Structures are given as structure tokens and as C-alpha cells.
Amino acid sequence: MGVTLRDKGIRAHDALIIDRNGDFHITNGFSAEKLEELEESGIEAVNVFNFGPVLVLDGEQQYHRGEKAHYTNTSPNSPNPRTAIGQLGPLEYLMVVTDGREVQSPLPDGGTRQHLGCTIVTLTEFMASYHCIQAYNLDGGNSTAMYFDGGTFSTSVRRGVTDIIYFATLADPGN
């Protein structure tokens, strides 16, 4: 099944598993055993992302304002560039990218504005406000670009990127 693109050991971060129907399944602390359990339950993993953390799980927000977020690889309590993906319903998704740290945007008056990014709590609240059933934080630390319908929405890529999440609509060529 599938093609192996990377064959390295992984840390036990939360994992986002996307099945053949395009549905999201999230495990806290990913392991080969958890993947086997999922597949034994009849869910075939087509894509697995290992970064995290999970932001919304089964419609429940996982981080709340006033709480200190704990997660090993994301500086969760500091504003940073972030990328998140959420599932709103069957084959309905939300992608969010926020630049941060060093990104400057021009203002109409000729000045510039620095993008500060956001915290994990802020990102969680945003994804929950759009009623995501599942939402997951992907790596956004100067390694994300978002293009949509021919337009560029984020270009904070400052290092080589070898991964892509791509959405396409299958349309009947006769219509």
C-alpha cells in the first residue's frame, strides 16, 4: 500500500491520519501500534502527518484561553508562524496559514506591518470557531506557502520544503 517517502524514526507526537474517504482521524501520541489498531478497525490510512498538536478532536477544542499549552515541538505559548488543517464535514476542509516572526507586509500609506503569527491557543480557537470536527497543527515555521485559485496568500518559505498538501476537484469533463 502506498509509497514510502521517508523511512526515519518518529517521535510520539499527535498524528493526523487521512483515510481513503478523505476523513481525518487523530491519535494522541502516534505509534505503529496505533496505526495497526486503526487499520484493524477498517480504516485505511492513505496519508499520515506527524507533527501536531491536535487542535480540535471530535468537535472539542483541545486548548483554551488562560491555560498554558504543552507540546514539545511548537513553542505553543509564543506567537509563531502556523499552518493548520481542519475537517468541516465530508470532503470539506479548512486550511489556515499565518506568517510570523520576520514577515513584513506593505501598508497603503507606504509603511509596513510585521506579522507576529499566533499561539496554539489562538489557532485552536480560530479552528473551533469555524466548527471543525477535527483540526491539526502542521509545521508553519517559515516552511509554508499557500496558493489558492491562482493567488498567493503566504510566502514565508525560508527553507527547502519537500512536502505538499494539494486539493483538487474531480469534475466531469463533459460539463
Regions found by a protein language model. Give the residues of each.
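Gly/Ser/Thr/Pro-rich low-complexity, intrinsically disordered segments
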Residues: 1-175
